[in-house]
């Protein structure tokens, strides 16, 4: 696993280095050659290595080849990260060989057999480290972003729901999806490709390619299908643990790797300077300028609420600490945010046929104007006439603005 992670982070670091050099002058970031068909890869290509035995994290599989004759985005815009196996920094889907395409599959290993432990299971996990949180059947599950930086997706079934936890480090996008599409349960892997600097996944059942932020199939037989986003929340680990003391924490994978993620290497995160570079339009992988939406800075972190067939983006930097009462798709919702937008969640705000309006009162509590009841960040009424009540979470995505705008060109932006 060390070699695998070094490959991914080395590739990421190269992109950052190029961006840093570009910041020193006015000329645009140089774009490397797209491909080099004559170059022979090293005799020993990168493997999933000595620390993690091959196949121990992922489902053994025979995956159909993606049908490249069916697509909704240009094949040349889907770029494979070669991790140094060719002279080219990336190779487009329109030019990649079948052999290299297969070799790069799951070079970033997803987790198909997750193991969980208690809140103290990861010694490196600090209270300020972000986690992607999910609730089901009275249980809470936490997925540290530092782990998702390395593995990017987790296939699991929780509370009888087949789900996919996803994260793309290049656009800070954390989304939980249902894995069910038209009655079929899909299992997902990593193509090692990116579209508009966002993770491209594939499904084992059809080989189709999926754009992560939108959850949309863009190449293959399922092109046009979308995954259903599920409610989740992002917040610092200390806050999640305080809300859910009995939370389960992903710690590794079944089959002897249950404590794999306790290793100190997983404590490494991405430097804060990356967001500034994205705001300056300097991406680690190419992004089509025609697809950028200037209504917000490209690196603005937004929470996107999707319900009732509508999508609305809430700029977290503008909101700060507060409660935003809004309507999306005809549904009354509220966005709770604290810690300068690092803690964020969204809920339907109708309780027992009464629509509530919320204000932030401090100390992680929110008060509804109608009854004066106090609610915590988990949507639980802890004081007042509605004590014991619970708000229902709404499906969300947390991401850089550029990825949301590309996924949903007609997205609305909430303005106070």
Q: Across the structure, where does each feature detected by a protein language model lie?
A:
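Bacterial signal peptide processing site
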Residues: 24-27
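Intrinsically disordered, low-complexity Ser/Thr- and Pro-rich stretches
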Residues: 1-2, 44
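C-terminal motif of bacterial Sec signal peptides marking the signal peptidase cleavage site
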Residues: 19-22
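Bacterial N-terminal signal peptides that target proteins for export
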Residues: 2-13
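Mid-to-C-terminal functional-domain signal that highlights helix-capping/loop sites
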Residues: 30-416
């Amino acid at each position: 696993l060390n070699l695998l992670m070094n490959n991914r982070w080395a590739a990421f670091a190269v992109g950052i280095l190029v961006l840093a050099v570009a910041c020193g002058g006015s000329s645009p970031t140089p774009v490397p050659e797209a491909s080099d068909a004559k170059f022979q890869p090293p005799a020993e290509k990168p493997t999933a290595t000595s620390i993690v035995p091959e196949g121990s994290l992922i489902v053994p599989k025979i995956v159909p080849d993606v049908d490249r004759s069916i697509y909704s985005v240009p094949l040349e815009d889907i770029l494979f990260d070669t991790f140094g196996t060719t002279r080219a920094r990336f190779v487009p889907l329109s030019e990649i060989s079948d052999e290299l395409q297969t070799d790069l599959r799951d070079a970033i290993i997803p987790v198909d057999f997750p193991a969980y432990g208690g809140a103290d299971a990861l010694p490196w996990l600090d209270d300020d480290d972000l986690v992607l949180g999910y609730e089901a059947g009275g249980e809470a599950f936490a997925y540290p972003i530092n782990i998702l930086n390395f593995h990017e997706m987790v296939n699991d079934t929780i509370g009888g729901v087949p789900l996919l936890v996803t994260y793309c480090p290049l656009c800070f996008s954390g989304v939980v999806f249902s894995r069910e599409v038209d009655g079929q349960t899909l299992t997902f892997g990593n193509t090692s490709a990116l579209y508009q600097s966002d993770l491209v996944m594939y499904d084992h059942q059809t080989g189709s390619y999926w754009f992560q932020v939108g959850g949309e199939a863009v190449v293959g037989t399922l092109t046009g299908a979308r995954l259903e986003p599920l409610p989740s929340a992002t917040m610092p680990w200390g806050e999640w643990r305080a809300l859910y003391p009995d939370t389960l924490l992903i710690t590794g994978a079944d089959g002897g790797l249950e404590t794999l993620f306790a290793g100190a290497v997983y404590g490494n995160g991405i430097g804060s300077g990356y967001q500034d570079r994205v705001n300056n339009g300097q991406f680690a992988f190419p992004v089509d300028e025609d697809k950028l939406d200037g209504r917000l800075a490209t690196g603005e972190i937004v929470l996107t609420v999707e319900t009732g067939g509508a999508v609305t983006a809430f700029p977290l930097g503008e909101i700060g600490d507060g409660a935003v009462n809004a309507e999306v798709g005809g549904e009354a919702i509220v966005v709770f945010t604290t810690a300068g937008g690092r803690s964020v969640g969204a809920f339907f705000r109708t309780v027992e046929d009464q629509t509530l309006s919320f204000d932030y009162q401090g100390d992680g509590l929110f008060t509804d104007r109608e009854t004066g009841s106090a609610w915590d960040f988990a949507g639980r009424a802890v004081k007042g006439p509605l004590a014991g009540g619970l708000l229902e979470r709404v499906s969300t995505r947390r991401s850089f603005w550029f990825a949301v705008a590309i996924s949903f060109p007609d997205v609305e932006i909430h303005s106070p």
